[in-house]
């Protein structure tokens, strides 16, 4: 793992990960990392851009449109002593909720990137998920969480590839107009 980045936030270089024709690039914006996923195919670039800040549904900074990530590290994943692929891990905070993220090439699709997100909740969420802008609309990914217990950890995962965004392990994907 690379050492913690001690540079001032305004001088943090982009962090990227790729899988085939898909690349995710994280850039520092204000007080958090934001990202864009691009698919280069057939001479065109299709992109998904994270929507950051308050979610339009909740309009409350405690419930951001996408997980707030304030620290990122690029790591090399290992499994059972064998060398694995690259990964980006991140952590962050919004209100009383703590986020963690793992971003890796999807182990089941050669041309996709998998996002696995966890949020530790201490109060009932108004909104919880990930949101992307694409082609004038919004794509929202939410967890299948049927619990009301607090505190609790909610996990959602999704994969982004040439075919679009797909929920993994019960996550649901919906599309709305912006």
Predicted stretch roles:
Residues 9, 16-18, 29, 82, ...:
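Solvent-exposed loop and beta-edge segments used for protein-protein assembly and interaction
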Residues 114-138:
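Acidic (Asp/Glu-rich), glycine- and aromatic
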Residues 40-50, 93-102, 124-127, 138-139, ...:
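Short, surface-exposed beta-strand/loop "edge" segments at domain boundaries and coil↔beta transitions
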């Amino acid at each position: 793992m690379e050492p913690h980045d001690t540079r001032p936030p305004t001088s943090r270089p982009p962090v990227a990960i790729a899988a085939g024709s898909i690349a995710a690039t994280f850039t520092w914006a204000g007080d958090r990392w934001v990202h864009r996923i691009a698919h280069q195919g057939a001479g065109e670039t299709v992109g998904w851009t994270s929507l950051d800040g308050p979610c339009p549904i909740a309009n409350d900074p405690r419930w951001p449109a996408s997980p707030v990530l304030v620290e990122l590290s690029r790591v090399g994943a290992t499994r059972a002593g064998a060398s694995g692929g690259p990964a980006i891990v991140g952590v962050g905070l919004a209100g009383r909720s703590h986020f963690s993220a793992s971003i890796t090439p999807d182990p089941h699709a050669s041309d996709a990137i998998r996002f696995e997100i966890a949020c530790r909740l201490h109060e009932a969420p108004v909104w919880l998920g990930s949101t992307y802008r694409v082609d004038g609309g919004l794509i929202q990914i939410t967890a299948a969480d049927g619990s009301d217990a607090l505190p609790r950890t909610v996990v959602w995962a999704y994969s982004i590839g040439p075919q679009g965004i797909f929920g993994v392990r019960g996550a649901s994907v919906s599309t709305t107009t912006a």
